[in-house]
């Protein structure tokens, strides 16, 4: 997709273990897409802290995933998917916008903004101050 869009010179990707690898630094944007639901709360906190350290000042993280309401009973697709994660992963679940926002703030990020998407998922964007 990067080659088709002509962005291969502007976007870099890396292979690694998101649970343990150090990401280095100097990034303007880190995209975490359909990942956080596979991780426990502790693993997500650790991931976001490492992402924060990898970003330049003003750099952003974008998290795309199911975003549950605070009571975690919906939207329906995200709540049902959370059951799947609870059964099939060691600690994964769908998380609420409130939980993500708390983790992002704990890691040091500033304002958190939600971008609605068509369908059951959403995007949260936060900047490193």
Regions found by a protein language model. Give the residues of each.
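Alpha-helical subdomain
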Residues: 1-129
């Amino acid at each position: 997709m990067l080659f088709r869009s002509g962005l291969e010179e502007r976007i870099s990707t890396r292979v690694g273990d998101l649970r343990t690898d150090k990401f280095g630094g100097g990034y303007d944007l880190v995209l975490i897409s359909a990942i956080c639901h596979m991780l426990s709360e502790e693993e997500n906190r650790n991931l976001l802290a490492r992402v924060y350290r990898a970003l330049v000042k003003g750099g952003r993280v974008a998290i795309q995933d199911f975003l549950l309401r605070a009571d975690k009973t919906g939207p329906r697709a995200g709540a049902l998917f959370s059951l799947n994660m609870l059964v099939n992963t060691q600690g994964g679940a769908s998380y609420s916008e409130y939980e993500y926002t708390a983790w992002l703030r704990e890691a040091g990020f500033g304002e958190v903004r939600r971008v609605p998407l068509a369908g059951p998922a959403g995007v949260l964007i936060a900047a490193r101050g």
